[in-house]
């Protein structure tokens, strides 16, 4: 199929950096491949074209398409197969291996996969928290009480990861300032006043909402600052477009003010947390250095530092590329963008992406970077290419998606035009809407009714639908259920299991953050360190024993801690440490407690995976 006119304009644009804003199903990957091929056809050496993607699958697909494109040109195809087409992290790793000494790395460094890195982070966090629990008990308990969470180690790791988004963690923590309460409150008030000034009041609903904001502004100074901020309520539904957008800024300012007020009220704990984070960061770095290893963030940070050095190496790296092609630019994070800025030469950058499709799962992706890039080119009078023809979806799906998206906060307008070629007719509507309400008589919530209906409707569709070319009956693996929140997953799993329908749940969570894995980890932490009160408390509250907070408090106050129903069991486990490997201890314990009995397949699979990891780790480092 030949390129459309809008695709061709993007592929052949010259004399400027290119920004291609591509809607879903509009051929983003094809345009990037064709740009690569067009540059080769224009005489550019494939080895001097750098193409960066965000997944190995995408990089492989680009190379496959290019190889097919030049299938009859042996020598050229071979050069294409060796062209620098890779993920961001693949590119960084290659560059750092070439310049390991300049980057301050062991030339034989290895890259930790996410599971290995997470394991080191868990070990580092546990080690530091154990030291604090024993050596700085009072400060540690005050911090944990203020944190009000069951898993301080997971929270510590999460805060550390968030800080890494901004660069060097130690530098950020050392430069961390105080909280400007007055500034945050004034900014919130200014945003609210701006809303009252621009909002239309031509309906009773609009007038009532804006007058409520004015009344809230009038109460400033009459109540505690935190209570005043919490008192602000604003439903933007029904407001005019400009007021709705400003209302979103008001609520963002409210969240910022709450964060500032909360931080200010916990300043002592904040200082303790800063010290704890610095120790954790140092411990994590030490453990990586001991293995001559780096994680994905290190790849980015060290590449950025390498490109910022004085000397011939950075200049040679920049000069080796005549063109840089970037796929899915909306998934770029700030460090990656700074790497691109140091690599790029003027008018040699080609980027495709869609602000409305950022998947955020790529380490700290910041869609605003793509928006800023687009706005910068527009301010310079450069052309922006827009791909608006959708080749993937039926017109009914596109019109429904557009109707929903245009009312959603943070979604930028982008027209989706269905391709002219008609789809084969379907025996069922392409979009169905079903409304659910809780049934108090049946004692069932809306989610239970919804799960039943979804399973029933999927069974109907499986009997009715034909897919593919040539048509074939639809299979279960052809179907997917998307949920706005994870709350529905349990109901759905139960309904699918009851009907004998196979399903696999993708929760988008880290394996080590799954509740059952947290339970296993807490038990092992306690067995490794019986003085770890946090781990013991979590074990007692978990499904292993199911002891409530009040009972734990009473038992502890009366000197029965651990409580009678848990004490003997835990003593047997502690005794078994001397003669049995941890995976066998945990497996027998799970069997004795009936922990996995009646659990969904996902939980059983996670347990099997965790036990396998334990076996591997213990074999590699027994004891």
Place the predicted regions along the sequence by residue.
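Conserved ATP-dependent motor core of P-loop NTPases, especially the RecA-like helicase ATPase domain
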Residues: 15, 46-57, 70-228, 294, ...
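Accessory N-terminal region flanking or inserted into the helicase ATPase core
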Residues: 1-21, 30-31, 48-50, 108, ...
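Conserved motor-region signature of P-loop NTPase helicases/translocases
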Residues: 1-64, 115, 123, 193, ...
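Core structural elements
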Residues: 86-94, 146-165, 275-279, 297-299, ...
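Amphipathic alpha-helical segments in well-ordered regions
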Residues: 35, 91, 95, 99, ...
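Short coil/turn segments at secondary-structure boundaries
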Residues: 106-109, 134-144, 159, 171-176, ...
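Polynucleotide-recognition surfaces of large bacterial nucleic-acid defense/processing enzymes
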Residues: 446-451, 455, 536-582
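Amphipathic alpha-helical interaction segments
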Residues: 9, 90, 139-142, 154-158, ...
